[in-house]
Amino acid sequence: MNSIVTHAEFDIPRHKKLVSKSPYIAALQRRHFFAFDIVPNMMALVVVPYHLYVAPVRASDVVVFLLLWAVTGLGVTVGYHRLFTHRAFAAHDHVRTLLAFCGALAGQGPVISWAAIHRRHHELSDEPGDPHSPNLHGQTLRGRLKGLMHAHYTWMIEHDYPNVAHYTADLLKDRAIAGVNRHYYAIALAGLFVPGLICGLVTWQWQAAVSGILWGGFLRMAVLGHTIWAINSLLHRFGASPFVTGDHSHNAGFVSLLTFGEAWHNNHHAFPTSAKFGLRRGWSDPGWWTVCVLTSLGLASDIRQPNESLIERRLQEGRAR
């Protein structure tokens, strides 16, 4: 277990029940899995035949894809992950709400649920109880493949649900964030279809509207989803581990830009409350760059990151293994 993460870090009361499981919760999880994990992937497959037989690819398709991919990706890494889960920095109330909204557009789950699941992941990283470890299904080839599939995708079908009163009491007290959490489904569905509405109104062509839904909605959600899920699966199996963390987290710096800095996963597990994942010069971290921009605008403060001496000491521990 990652000893750096403690109950005190998140003000988690010890007496609460840790997880819940019921037919109602299981039904909600299956519904979400179908709506935001199966359907977007199926609809993404329609993109190629649609452009082969119905309409050519437009520049606006690529633009709406890239724009919403960046907005939702930063919403997850800067908002859901660094701000709400790890409290790695403080932000203006309107910025907090905007980041929660952008994260909800990604279709990765309501912000409070997401934070609760991720806090439990850090508490029990790669140990029994970790919601999405790939390392708990045995070391045979079949067990490893099953673990990777579990961590990447199938864990979301149905799983023990972390008690939000236990793990995220701080977020439940935030009325604005609780409001975004409550309207998650409406926000995520709007993220699928509003791009098509905008593209259709701008061009006044139904083909542009369909392309907007496919590229800005389903394809964007599917691509972003797989990059996030790959952190859970592949980066708890493969890559570099310069820091000793007590789990199986790894780095994959060559895809740090595509993951908005999340690919520095071993760095993150070594310093979970750091707003900066790319800890050294040249280690690309768009999420950190976004925090820096917010800070320069006076919209973020109390930035948490390890100093150079601590980083170097932890790196030396890693080299001495």
Predicted regions mapped to residue ranges:
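Catalytic glutamate of the conserved HExxH
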Residues: 82, 221, 233, 237, ...
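C-terminal accessory segments of proteins
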Residues: 224-242
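Active-site-proximal inter-transmembrane loops
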Residues: 168-176, 238-264, 269-271
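Non-catalytic, topology-defining segments of multipass membrane proteins
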Residues: 1-229, 274-321
